[in-house]
Regions:
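N-terminal Rossmann-like NAD(P)+-binding domain of SDR-like oxidoreductases, especially those catalyzing
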Residues: 1-199
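Substrate-binding strand-loop-helix patch
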Residues: 202-209
Length: 209
């Protein structure tokens, strides 16, 4: 079984449907708390593609008990995705979902010896460093300037040596913290893991806030 947390969201649902079409005989199961507005609209699409849905929350370990099915891979798409999260009274939800929830998913991966794929964010990079990147504005786009002496940055983008030190928002901090914990779990418990630092993602069935 492939478990996709946050699987009724924009990214999670599209991944689930893509995987089901790619490997039609596979058991694709999504888990989502349906908190984000519009996510319930994806349930029709998931059902149409014969994808199993579980109404659950990664903050609650009781919702992460899978005794009947062996989980081969967990794709962790669940998150409070707003960069503005934490500027209101949602700070506890942000931490409990983006950090504690990920730890709960890692413990599930440990129990099932599952592969673990984590959707992180380019928001792990500090905006103080990002703001040092020089560019100019053309008629229809921003164009990066050449010969910039910023460690980890080139016209090809940002690599692993780019600095992670500095302020990055509460959201970015939870994602970076999760990355570090994933690496520790991978080392200590031999969990095969992939961390994908996604940029701005847009497309069909994006519901917004």
């Amino acid at each position: 079984m492939i478990l996709i947390t946050g699987g009724a969201g924009f990214v999670g649902s599209n991944i689930a449907i893509y995987l089901k079409k790619l490997i039609s005989q596979s058991n694709i199961t999504v888990l989502d708390n349906l908190k984000r507005r519009g996510s319930e609209l994806n349930l029709i699409r998931l059902k149409k593609n014969k994808i199993n849905f579980i109404h659950g929350d990664i903050r609650n370990t009781e919702d992460l008990k899978f005794k009947k099915n062996k989980i081969s891979t967990i794709i962790e798409c669940s998150a409070e995705p707003s960069v503005l999260a934490g500027t209101s009274d949602e700070l506890a939800y942000l931490f409990n979902t983006n950090l504690t929830g990920t730890i709960n998913c890692l413990n599930l991966a440990k129990q099932h010896n599952s592969n673990f794929i984590f959707l992180s964010s380019n928001r792990v990079y500090p905006y103080t460093e990002i703001n040092k990147i020089k560019f100019f504005e053309s008629e229809n786009r921003f164009i990066l300037k050449e010969n910039q002496k910023i460690s980890g940055f080139s016209l090809n983008g940002i690599d692993e040596s780019f600095s992670l030190n500095g302020l990055k928002s509460f959201y970015g901090a939870t994602k970076l913290s999760s990355e570090l914990i994933i690496q520790e779990y991978s080392k200590s418990y031999k969990i095969k893991s992939i961390i994908n630092r996604c940029g701005v993602i847009a497309g069909p069935w994006q519901m917004g806030k």
